[in-house]
Regions:
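A short beta-strand motif characteristic of beta-propeller blades
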Residues: 1-3, 48-58, 95-103, 167-178
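Repeated scaffold domains used in trafficking and secretory/extracellular systems
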Residues: 6-17, 58-70, 106-122, 181-191
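Short coil/turn segments that connect the beta-strands within blades of beta-propeller domains
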Residues: 19-20, 74-76, 139, 192
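Residue position within the beta-strands of beta-propeller blades
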Residues: 24, 79-80, 143-145
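Structural motif
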Residues: 30-38, 84-89, 149-157
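Short loop/turn segments that connect beta-strands within beta-propeller blades
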Residues: 40-43, 91-94, 159-160
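Intrinsically disordered, low-complexity Ser/Thr- and acidic-rich flexible linkers and loops
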Residues: 122-132
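Hydrophobic/aromatic hotspots within intrinsically disordered, low-complexity regions
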Residues: 133, 137, 141-143
Length: 192
């Protein structure tokens, strides 16, 4: 198989099925569709297990978009931010669906997105026998957002389907007018 030479790889993220997949996310310069190559670490799959093409919403700037995937999702879902919006990309259905908008400042930019990682949790801290706690960590998505005058961190609890949960406290906005967060370049989680 030949790869279109006009495609530029914008990111490679890992996730899906316990973290066994890598997704190479490519697009032509200033393009309005993504080509995603799915690579598998599973013996029964070919190394390049699939290729997907997804049309993007018109407001998405692929040059500045950020991407993430989580080990908790087996349904070929990746997540993308552009501007002040978060999208779920359903590779199997070939759709990008808007999940969240930071409405406080329409000119804000989501500059980082990261899922919590169960491998960072000590076994003794996971007191649920079913492992639900670790699974929920993989469905907790943090966003680093820069507005004109400050940084904001938003944490979203997602559902098994990759939607924002409708439960109470499923969207947490971390900001303090007394102690402004400066410009955000990345976010990480500390489990101490």
């Amino acid at each position: 198989n030949k790869i279109d030479p006009s495609l530029e790889v914008h990111d490679i993220v890992t996730g899906g099925n316990g973290g066994n997949f890598a997704y190479a996310i490519a697009a032509p310069h200033n393009g309005k569709e993504l080509t995603v190559f799915k690579f598998s670490a599973q013996d029964e799959d070919p190394i390049c297990a699939a290729q997907y093409t997804i049309a993007l919403p018109s407001e998405v700037n692929v040059e500045t978009a950020k991407f993430a995937a989580s080990y908790a999702y087996t349904a070929n879902l990746i997540f993308m931010t552009s501007g002040n919006k978060l999208y779920r990309i359903d590779l199997g259905r070939g759709r990008a669906i808007e999940l969240y908008t930071y409405e406080t400042d329409p000119s804000a930019q989501i500059v980082a997105l990261k899922f919590k990682d169960s491998e960072s949790v000590r076994e003794e801290d996971d007191d649920e026998e079913t492992g639900e706690y670790k699974e929920k960590l993989g469905m907790s998505l943090g966003l680093g957002i820069n507005t004109a005058d400050k940084g904001v961190v938003v944490e979203l609890q997602l559902t098994v389907a990759g939607d924002v949960s409708r439960e109470e406290n499923s969207i947490c906005v971390y900001e303090d007018p007394e102690q402004l967060i400066g410009k955000i370049v990345d976010i990480s989680y500390n489990y101490e």
